[in-house]
Swiss-Prot record:
Belongs to the universal ribosomal protein uL30 family. InterPro entries: Ribo_uL30_ferredoxin-like_sf, Ribosomal_uL30_bac-type, Ribosomal_uL30_ferredoxin-like. GO terms for biological process: translation. One of its GO terms (cellular component) is cytosolic large ribosomal subunit. The keyword Ribonucleoprotein applies. PANTHER family: LARGE RIBOSOMAL SUBUNIT PROTEIN UL30M (PTHR15892:SF2), MITOCHONDRIAL RIBOSOMAL PROTEIN L30 (PTHR15892). Pfam families: Ribosomal_L30. This is Large ribosomal subunit protein uL30. The keyword Ribosomal protein applies. Keywords: Ribonucleoprotein, Ribosomal protein. Part of the 50S ribosomal subunit. Disulfide bonds: none annotated.
Length: 61
């Protein structure tokens, strides 16, 4: 199982921990989409920035 993560809000005015989570997920700009493996580490990063991203589950890797 994999997760398709899309950034929907910008990073201006966010806390450093949130910016670090977005960077480690590989998101830099609004509208950018990445696919990441579904694991507890990625889920925790998504939880930190859940108000700035949209997440979909996709089959495969």
């Amino acid at each position: 199982m994999a997760l398709k993560i899309t950034q929907v809000k910008g990073l201006v005015g966010t806390k450093p921990k949130q910016r670090d989570s977005m960077r480690s997920l590989g998101l830099k700009r609004i509208g950018q989409t990445v696919v990441r493996e579904d694991n507890p580490i990625v889920r925790g990063q998504i939880n930190t920035v859940r108000h700035m991203v949209e997440v979909e589950e996709v089959a495969g890797e």
